[in-house]
A protein has these predicted regions:
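Short alpha-helix within the catalytic core of nucleotide-sugar-dependent glycosyltransferases
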Residues: 22-26, 50-54, 86, 99-111, ...
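Membrane-interface aromatic/basic loop that binds lipid-linked glycans or pyrophosphate carriers
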Residues: 283-361
């Protein structure tokens, strides 16, 4: 079958993104692969986003619009997923954009290797104002640094997956092309959760057998960061990270890798990095906890069973993280308190440096 004969479904939840929406839609309509259906799901927008969706639908037969009461991106994606009729499906965000060959190139790989999932590299453009931004590159690991690598054996995929967890390939849904029948046969949908994307992707890869990676980058994730946004306090962050850690342990145990040295090291390091994030979160300007309450929270984080196990198994790669880990190992609440205040100081004074350090860890 020629690739042009294969329909691709693209699902895009939309909520109050009128400023960015036309560029996102145009990047889909300008794909070199033309056999597409685009679902724009207006999630109860209060700006002109819904009208923009309708305008595009009136001019393009491939555009389908769903208007729904505000109920979250997970609901928007799931409602469109019920209607999708393509052989493969992609999930894009409505304030990002994609390169014109993304669908064509990834579909050609899906056909060549009969893949259930194709995963590509991507860009994150972090904007500090309309003209000031940095671009960070995210590229999957492949054996021998090849541009493309296919796994048609689930055990090989699982054994190598720790390398691409490290490269952030599994967290977002939008750098991927999924075989639609694979999702529907397994009733895989986006769960109602505080983090729509990660549990969905974990469900996809749990039993997958045929996966293809490409180092080519197509997706541009736009991160808009004002000073106030970088200082936002995240409620219940620690509880969320604990739940994520349990899900990671569960997945690798299901895969039979609960004792695999490389996988355990990655999971442990990932957990400790997120404990650092939780400690730093206590020291932004929106946190209303007293000094004593913050110290109590730090003590709680450092005396958790998961922390005790992970700090022994984690092997940080960067010098600055080795220093931070050595402070954590002391379990000295006061030292960790000072450390977190310093990290927040760097974050406030040089958000670009902080963003780069956080990414390259």
């Amino acid at each position: 079958m020629l690739s042009n004969d294969i329909k691709i479904s693209i699902i895009m939840p939309v909520y109050n993104v009128a400023e960015y929406l036309p560029k996102a839609i145009d990047s889909v309509l300008n794909q070199s692969h033309k056999n597409i259906e685009l679902f724009l799901v207006d999630d109860g927008s209060t700006d002109s986003s819904g009208m923009i969706c309708d305008e595009y639908a009136s001019k393009n037969l491939c555009v389908n619009v769903i208007h729904q009461k505000n109920s979250g991106a997970h609901n928007a994606r799931n409602n469109a997923l019920k209607l999708a009729s393509g052989e493969y499906v992609c999930f894009f965000d409505s304030d990002d954009y994609v390169d014109s060959n993304m669908i064509k190139d990834m579909l050609e790989l899906a056909i060549k290797y009969n893949s259930d999932l194709v995963i590509s590299g991507f860009y994150i453009n972090t904007y500090y104002n309309s003209n000031d931004y940095i671009t960070l590159n995210y590229i999957p690991y492949t054996t021998n640094d090849s541009t493309v690598e296919n796994f048609n054996n689930k055990n090989d995929f699982r054994m190598n997956s720790y390398l691409n967890f490290d490269r952030n390939m599994f967290y977002p849904p939008w750098n991927k092309m999924y075989r639609l029948s694979y999702l529907k046969e397994r009733n895989i949908t986006f769960p109602i959760t505080y983090r729509d994307d990660f549990p969905f992707v974990l469900s996809v890869i749990k039993d997958i057998e045929n996966v293809t990676y490409t180092k080519n980058q197509y997706y541009h994730f736009l991160r808009k960061r004002s000073d106030s946004e970088t200082q936002k306090f995240v409620e219940n962050l620690y509880e969320k990270r604990e739940e994520e850690h349990i899900e990671m342990l569960s997945l690798f145990s299901y895969w039979g890798l609960q004792n695999d040295k490389n996988s355990i090291e990655m999971i442990s390091r990932r957990y400790i990095d997120r404990v650092i994030e939780c400690i730093v979160n206590l020291f932004n300007k929106e946190c209303k906890l007293s000094s004593n309450e913050k110290e109590s929270m730090i003590y709680k984080y450092l005396n958790n069973d998961n922390f005790n196990k992970c700090i022994k198994n984690a092997n940080p790669k960067k010098l600055y993280l080795k220093i931070i880990y050595s402070i954590l190992k002391t379990k000295n609440v006061y030292l960790c308190y000072i450390m977190a205040k310093f990290i927040n100081f760097v974050k406030k004074k040089n958000i670009k440096l902080f963003s780069v350090l956080k990414t390259n860890r």
